[in-house]
UniProtKB/Swiss-Prot annotation:
GO biological process, one term: response to toxic substance
Topological domains, Cytoplasmic: 1-6, 58-67, 115-125, 170-173, 228-239, 291-306
Protein's recorded name: Uncharacterized inner membrane transporter YedA
Pfam family, one: EamA
Disulphide-bridged cysteine pairs: none
Lineage of source species: Bacteria, Pseudomonadati, Pseudomonadota, Gammaproteobacteria, Enterobacterales
Origin species: Escherichia coli (strain K12)
Topology within the bilayer: Multi-pass membrane protein
Gene encoding the protein: yedA
Family note: Belongs to the EamA transporter family.
Record localization: Cell inner membrane
GO terms under cellular component: plasma membrane
InterPro entries assigned to the protein according to its UniProt record, in alphabetical order: AA-Vitamin_Transporters, CO/AA/NH_transpt, EamA_dom
Chief location: membrane
Top-level taxon: Bacteria
Length: 306
């Protein structure tokens, strides 16, 4: 029974670790033939429309106004700002691996916001995050950190927005189930398309086949599947656990680079992979391996009863 209860958790984490880890590489392919804000907007609009149509055909109804607006706000924070900044940065020639490294700061910001919101955090989570960040540094110590610094700043801003949205999203009422993801993607898509028009983005030529395939992959797998998995996590587990994917994503990005891009890894970088996986185990399984001890409140007798 215990294993069956954990299946949704493991499935959601797998979607985030593997699918989102590959999106950095796919975004880089897409922005070669799409303007960045436009590509992100098309991605989320397509995903949101498809998911909403599916839900409405299945008999689901639109949520009340308050949860709907809450979901739109979370979509703005997580997708329009969080993911949009990554897309713009990669268009500015920030390497996908560097993008993944900067996004790895999300769990650190998440724990900080968690403390501000009064959410209890475990010492083991802090230890896991510290080890994970150390692994990220090791992973890139032998690489070429020649990415655009302004692009890195954009990703950092997106990471802060994503972390705040993750914590805030766990404290407010959101639509039930996949309806939350549909509204968030629609809202983000609209905002990104407006931003694209304001920025004066235009298609100078028809995107290539790889560009269309990249948007399709990002819409279906990177948005509909992975984002709904993420929303499941932030509603059901601690924010630190929900953002632990940030440790695995750089690993997946590096493996894609070695497998498809002809890159090589040094010994210290391979060692870093093991350190990062260990950190993920601490963050994701620590609450089950080392559950918090229940606090027994002392019994205080009422003086009037004596």
């Amino acid at each position: 029974m215990r294993f069956r209860q954990l299946l949704p958790l493991f499935g959601a984490l797998f979607a985030l670790y593997i699918i989102w880890g590959s999106t950095y590489f796919v975004i880089r392919i897409g922005v070669e033939s799409w303007p960045p804000l436009m590509m992100a907007g098309v991605r989320f609009l397509a995903a949101g429309i498809l998911l909403l149509a599916f839900l409405l055909l299945r008999g689901h109804k639109l949520p009340p106004l308050r949860p709907l607006l809450n979901a739109a706000l979370i979509g703005l924070l997580l997708l329009a700002v969080g993911n949009g900044m990554v897309t713009v940065a990669e268009h500015q020639n920030v390497p996908s691996g560097i993008a993944a490294v900067v996004v790895a700061t999300v769990p650190l910001f998440t724990l900080c916001f968690s403390r501000l919101f009064g959410i209890k955090t475990r010492k083991l989570e802090w230890v896991g995050i510290a080890i994970g960040l150390a692994g990220i540094i090791m992973l890139n110590s032998g690489g070429n950190l020649s990415g655009n610094p302004w692009g890195a700043i954009l990703i950092l801003i997106g990471s802060i927005s994503w972390a705040f949205g993750s914590v805030y999203g766990s404290r407010i009422t959101l639509p039930v189930g996949m309806m939350a993801g549909a509204i968030e993607m629609l809202a983000a898509g609209v905002v990104l398309m407006i931003a694209s028009m304001i920025a004066g983005e235009k298609l100078t030529a028809l995107p290539s086949l790889s560009g269309f395939l990249a948007v399709g992959y990002l819409a279906l797998f990177g948005s509909i599947i992975a984002i709904n998995a993420y929303m499941y996590l932030i509603r059901n587990v601690s924010p630190a656990l929900a953002t632990s994917y940030a440790y695995v994503n750089p690993v997946v990005a590096v493996l894609l680079g070695t497998g498809l891009g002809g890159e090589t890894l040094s010994k210290i970088e391979w060692l870093a992979l093991g350190v990062i996986v260990f950190a993920v185990v601490l963050v994701t399984l620590g609450k089950y391996l080392f559950p918090a001890k229940p606090v027994v409140a002392p019994v205080i007798q009422d003086a009037s009863s004596e």
